[in-house]
């Protein structure tokens, strides 16, 4: 990413907000692609930082050309000077939580951590923090809270997707 370039991300909002703040400070343009189920408040927050927000339909498969993943990927292909942070497949996501968030939680709790609960999201927070906490105390329980309709339920209990994923509210 070079000065004046464009940061692109498929997001449900939280990563987008962080990227939008940094982009505004550094002078980058940013484009965030999100499903239509995301609240207007999150969209407005991204726009307040100068981001362009592209809305896609919720009820499409991830590899459908209309999905927020595919629209973001395509946008990068056709936009010179753009960079796709790709939070869902970027190994730096979990690595940074392993290096920063995990130690912060451990230190602030003075090592008295029994259970860590996080939403699944991209998996970066729960896997990075979980790895760190387990390295400090193998008995720490790591709990994933995910909404009804998520494919993770079937994968966890049956090691396969048995029910067709469907849309769920994120807020």
Residue ranges of model-derived segments:
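Helix-rich "cap/lid" substructures immediately adjacent to catalytic or cofactor-binding pockets
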Residues: 1-6
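Active-site-proximal loop->helix
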Residues: 8, 17-75, 148, 152-165
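Hydrophobic beta-strand scaffold residues
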Residues: 30, 53, 83-84, 142
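A short helix-to-beta-strand connector/capping loop
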Residues: 50-51, 80-81, 138
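Short glycine/proline- and acidic residue-enriched helix-loop micro-motifs
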Residues: 55, 83-92
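Glycine-rich phosphate/pyrophosphate-binding loop at beta-loop-alpha junctions
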Residues: 58-66, 90-171
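Phosphate/diphosphate-binding glycine-rich loops and adjacent basic-rich segments that engage nucleotide
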Residues: 74-82, 86
């Amino acid at each position: 990413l070079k000065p004046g370039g464009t940061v692109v991300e498929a997001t449900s909002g939280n990563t987008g907000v962080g990227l939008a703040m940094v982009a505004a400070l550094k002078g980058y343009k940013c484009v965030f692609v999100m499903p239509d189920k995301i609240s207007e408040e999150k969209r407005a927050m991204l726009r307040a930082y100068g981001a362009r927000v592209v809305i896609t339909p919720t009820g499409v498969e991830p590899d459908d050309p209309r999905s927020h993943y595919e629209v973001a990927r395509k946008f990068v292909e056709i936009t010179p000077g753009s960079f796709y942070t790709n939070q869902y497949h970027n190994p730096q996501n979990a690595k940074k939580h392993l290096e920063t968030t995990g130690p912060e939680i451990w230190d602030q709790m003075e090592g008295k951590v029994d259970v860590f609960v996080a939403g699944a999201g991209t998996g970066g927070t729960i896997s990075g923090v979980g790895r760190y906490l387990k390295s400090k105390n193998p008995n720490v329980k790591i709990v994933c809270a995910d909404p009804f309709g998520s494919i993770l339920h079937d994968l966890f209990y049956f090691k396969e997707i048995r029910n067709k994923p469907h849309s769920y509210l994120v807020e």
